[in-house]
Amino acid sequence: MKTIHVSVVTPDGPVYESEVEMVSTRAQSGELGILHGHIPMVAPLQIGAVRLKKASSTELVAVSGGFLEVRPDKVTILAQAAETAEEIDVARAEEAKKRAEMRLDSKQDDVDVKRAEIALKRAVNRLDISQRKF
């Protein structure tokens, strides 16, 4: 099977770069599966997992939004934040989840609910990917 080059980049620098058989992820418009030769496109990404299928394994990268650029032989993911499953600090993600849940449970008027919901979604995504629940 032909491969496609994938780069995952954040403002802090590159996170992942490799040749893979298939890239699948969730964009704002729905689930995308990308193989070599895919038509060029750009799509905004949701907080979620990028699944990178190789011949004998699947690697996971947690992304916190961003954009996906597809060319026939290359996929570039420009993410606000990204971590491979192996790089995720589970204790830190669990703490972030607890903080977000506490903010959402708080009855204070100064809590930014939308921001707390996004923080919770990011933390849960990181935990799911670290435990390979995809």
Curated annotation (Swiss-Prot):
GO annotation, cellular component aspect: plasma membrane; proton-transporting ATP synthase complex
Bilayer disposition of the protein: Peripheral membrane protein
Localization, UniProt: Cell membrane
The keyword Membrane is assigned to this record: yes
Superkingdom per UniProt: Bacteria
Any one GO molecular-function label of the UniProt entry: ATP binding
Keywords on record: ATP synthesis, Cell membrane, CF(1), Hydrogen ion transport, Ion transport, Membrane, Transport
NCBIfam families linked: ATP_synt_epsi, PRK00571.1-3, PRK13446.1
Family: Belongs to the ATPase epsilon chain family.
Protein task: Produces ATP from ADP in the presence of a proton gradient across the membrane.
PANTHER family linked: ATP SYNTHASE DELTA/EPSILON CHAIN, ATP SYNTHASE EPSILON CHAIN, CHLOROPLASTIC
Complex formation: F-type ATPases have 2 components, CF(1) - the catalytic core - and CF(0) - the membrane proton channel. CF(1) has five subunits: alpha(3), beta(3), gamma(1), delta(1), epsilon(1). CF(0) has three main subunits: a, b and c.
Name under which the protein is recorded: ATP synthase epsilon chain
Organism: Priestia megaterium (strain ATCC 12872 / QMB1551) (Bacillus megaterium)
